C-alpha cells in the first residue's frame, strides 16, 4: 500500500490579529496537525541599530522606547546602564530607586497586556477588559513623570530626566493596595477553568534543555523550571536591596508560562512597596556637568549656562573609548545592549539583544504535532513584540 497523505501549506499573517504584530507564519499541515511552522520576520525592520550610530547618546534614548513598545522603560534602563558603564559615572540613590520602581510598574504593564490578550486569543473577553482598566492607571503614572503615556524617554545616563511629581508616590501606593484583589479576580476566572486548562496544559512544552539550547530567557526560561533572573543573579541599581522571589514552573508548557507571569506581578508589587518605603531624598541626576544640563534658574542668569545647555543637546557629550555589554531583566526576558565607543559623542556600534528573537525561533519545535488552534495559544505565551524582534 502507498501512503497518499498530502500536506497543506498555509500562510498565517502578517495581517492576522492573533499573530501579535506583523508575524508571517508558513505552516506545513497534515489536516489540522502542524508539521512545521516557519516564521518570516523583518516586516517591521526600521534600521534602529544603524540610526543610533548617527545620534548622540542622549538622542538615542527614544529609539529604545520604540523597540518593545509595551515595556519601554526597561529598554531605556539597559541603554542607560551601558552608557554609565563606559562613563564610569555614579547614579544618585534616589534615581536608582525611581528606576527600579518604574521598571517593576513596566513589568506589570507588560504582563497585564500579555495575559489579557492571551485570554482573548483563546476566546475569553472579560480578563482583557479588567486588566486594561489597571493598565490605564500605570499609563497615567508614566504620563505624570514623563508627559507621555507610551514612549516615555524618561531614563537618562546618570539618572532620570526629572524628579517625581508631588503626590505620585501616594498614588502608586494606592494602586498597589487595590491591584492584588483584581489579580485574584482574574485568577478565579482562569486558574482552574476547565476550558482554559484544556487549551494551555501540555501545549507548547519546552524542556529545561530545549529552553537553554534555544537561548530562552525571562518567563519562557523560568516556565521550564530554571530559576534564572538577572535581578537576582546579576543585580543592577538597587535590586540587591530588594526582597523578592523568582517564580518558576514545572512542565514548561503554556500554562506554566501564564502562571509564572501571574506570580511575577505579585513579586513586582512587593518590590514597588519596598521602593516607596525606602525612597531616599536627594538628587535624581548625576552632578557631573558634562552629563547633566544646567537648571532653568541658572540659564536665566548666566549666558555660559545657556551655551552649555545648547551644546549638550546639539553636540552631546564624549564617551571614553571602550566596549561594554549590559543587560536587564525586561518583562519578556534578558534585554541586552552592547555598546562600542571610539571616544566620540556617538556610538560606533550599538547591538541590541532582544529576548523575543530567540523565543520566536522556538515556535517551530513547540508547535510540532499540535493543532492549528494551539499555535495561536503558543504565540500568545511567547509574548512577542515585533518592534524588538525586527528592530
UniProtKB/Swiss-Prot annotation:
Keyword Glycoprotein: no
Major subcellular location class: membrane
Reaction equations catalysed: a quinone + NADH + 5 H(+)(in) = a quinol + NAD(+) + 4 H(+)(out)
Membrane topology term: Peripheral membrane protein
Family, per entry: Belongs to the complex I 49 kDa subunit family.
Assembly: NDH-1 is composed of 14 different subunits. Subunits NuoB, C, D, E, F, and G constitute the peripheral sector of the complex.
The protein's name in its UniProt record: NADH-quinone oxidoreductase subunit D
Organism: Rickettsia massiliae (strain Mtu5)
Gene this chain is encoded by: nuoD
Amino acid at each position: 500500500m502507498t501512503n497518499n497523505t498530502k500536506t497543506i501549506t498555509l500562510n498565517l499573517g502578517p495581517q492576522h490579529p492573533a499573530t501579535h504584530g506583523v508575524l508571517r507564519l508558513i505552516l506545513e499541515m497534515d489536516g489540522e496537525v502542524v508539521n512545521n511552522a516557519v516564521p518570516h520576520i523583518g516586516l517591521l525592520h526600521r534600521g534602529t541599530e544603524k540610526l543610533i550610530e548617527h545620534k548622540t547618546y542622549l538622542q538615542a534614548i527614544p529609539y529604545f522606547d520604540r523597540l518593545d513598545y509595551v515595556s519601554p522603560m526597561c529598554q531605556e534602563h539597559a541603554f542607560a546602564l551601558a552608557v554609565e558603564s563606559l562613563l564610569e559615572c555614579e547614579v544618585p540613590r534616589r534615581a536608582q530607586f525611581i528606576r527600579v520602581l518604574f521598571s517593576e510598574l513596566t513589568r506589570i504593564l507588560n504582563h497585564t497586556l500579555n495575559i489579557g490578550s492571551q485570554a482573548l486569543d483563546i476566546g475569553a473577553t472579560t480578563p482583557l477588559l479588567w486588566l486594561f482598566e489597571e493598565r490605564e492607571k500605570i499609563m497615567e503614572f508614566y504620563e505624570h513623570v514623563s508627559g507621555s503615556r507610551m514612549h516615555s524617554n524618561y531614563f537618562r545616563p546618570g539618572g532620570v530626566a526629572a524628579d517625581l511629581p508631588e503626590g505620585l508616590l501616594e498614588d502608586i501606593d494606592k494602586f498597589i493596595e487595590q491591584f492584588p484583589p483584581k489579580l485574584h479576580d482574574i485568577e478565579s476566572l482562569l486558574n482552574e477553568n476547565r476550558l482554559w486548562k484544556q487549551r494551555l496544559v501540555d501545549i507548547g512544552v519546552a524542556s529545561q534543555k530545549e529552553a537553554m539550547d534555544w537561548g530562552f530567557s525571562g518567563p519562557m526560561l523560568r516556565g521550564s523550571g530554571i530559576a534564572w533572573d538577572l535581578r537576582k543573579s546579576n543585580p543592577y541599581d538597587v535590586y540587591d536591596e530588594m526582597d523578592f522571589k523568582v517564580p518558576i514552573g514545572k512542565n514548561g508548557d503554556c500554562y506554566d508560562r501564564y502562571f509564572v507571569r501571574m506570580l511575577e506581578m505579585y513579586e513586582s508589587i512587593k518590590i514597588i512597596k519596598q521602593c516607596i518605603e525606602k525612597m531616599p531624598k536627594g538628587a535624581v541626576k548625576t552632578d557631573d556637568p558634562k552629563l547633566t544640563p544646567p537648571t532653568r534658574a541658572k540659564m536665566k542668569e548666566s549666558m555660559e549656562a545657556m551655551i552649555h545647555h545648547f551644546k549638550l543637546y546639539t553636540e552631546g557629550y564624549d564617551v571614553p573609548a571602550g566596549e561594554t555589554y549590559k543587560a536587564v531583566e525586561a518583562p519578556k526576558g534578558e534585554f541586552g545592549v552592547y555598546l562600542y565607543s571610539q571616544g566620540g559623542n556617538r556610538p560606533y556600534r550599538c547591538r541590541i539583544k532582544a529576548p523575543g528573537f530567540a523565543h520566536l525561533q522556538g515556535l517551530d519545535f513547540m508547535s510540532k504535532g499540535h493543532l492549528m488552534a494551539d499555535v495561536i495559544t503558543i504565540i500568545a505565551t511567547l509574548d512577542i513584540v515585533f518592534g524588538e524582534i525586527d528592530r
